Amino acid sequence: FDESNAIASSLEITSPRADVAIGRSPDNSDIIEWLSPTPGATNNTANVFTDELLPPVLSVATGIVNSSFDLEITNPNAGGVETKLVYTLDGSEPTITSDTYTGTPIAINNSTVIRAKIFATVDENYLPSFDTYGTYLFDVEHTTPILLLTTQNDNLYGPDGIFDNYNSDWVKAAHVTYLTKEAGHPTLFETRTAIRMDGGAGGSRAYPQHSFRLSFDHAALGEETINEQLIPNIPFRDKYSDVYLRNGSNQWLTFPHKDACQVSMMSNGTNNYYSAMEPVSV
């Protein structure tokens, strides 16, 4: 903005990730770069990222498994840059000091969440890859779709966690995979998403089982809208930027679908507006 508060220059962008800035480098330049954040300070001292690494590839896709298997992880980046492939098996975000994948297959013997990531070890101008997620559930079968939600433990618990601070509107990063209710629960989609608590203080927030809102196209933490028919009784709706994972409020432990069922029955055959729903196991 100039001295009269008129826009002097603007740029519409989509952030590549939450911990990366986009700005002019050097200051007042016409060149726009990915930068290390320098809030309130000059961009002249920021590290400039010229490229990003490709994410690792897992040999077995997320889903339901019935027996133990060996998991292999592939680094798809060419040999022009020195990299390190790391992983975790507890759902936490990999760091450069996490376990290094050396090429030896990882034995998966029970339900496991793996996150893998690739870092440049020498060239600081390369952004680390996005995380690759694999969630393997052993001998699971549901009559409902299954929604797999992975996030850092301290995003939920502790002084900065949204479970332990359920009255906050804090937004956290997560990854979601949707498995359909068809035989074998095939994957419908997976994506990065933002998550936050939702609902009223009298039920949806305060009870041990909480309600979430997922924002698939969140500008910093999400990825894109979901172009799928997620709720069967409104097949004309095939684009979702948000969904509400509702715990059933005061009926959360006895009849969590009560409100949704009553509303659906009262709206059947009428032109009344109502909230459609699809039961899901999370």
Where on the chain are the PLM-derived regions?
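Secretome/extracellular-domain signature
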Residues: 1-5
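Short, compositionally stereotyped local motifs that mark structural "simplifiers"
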Residues: 6, 14-194, 218
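A broad structural signal for short, well-ordered beta-strand segments within beta-sheet-rich domains
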Residues: 7-10, 82, 240, 257
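Short beta-alpha junctions and helix-cap segments that line functional grooves
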Residues: 8-11, 277-279
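Short Gly/Pro-enriched turn/cap motifs at secondary-structure boundaries
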Residues: 12, 62, 202-204
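Conserved ATP-binding subdomain of kinase catalytic cores across diverse folds
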Residues: 149, 160, 165-282
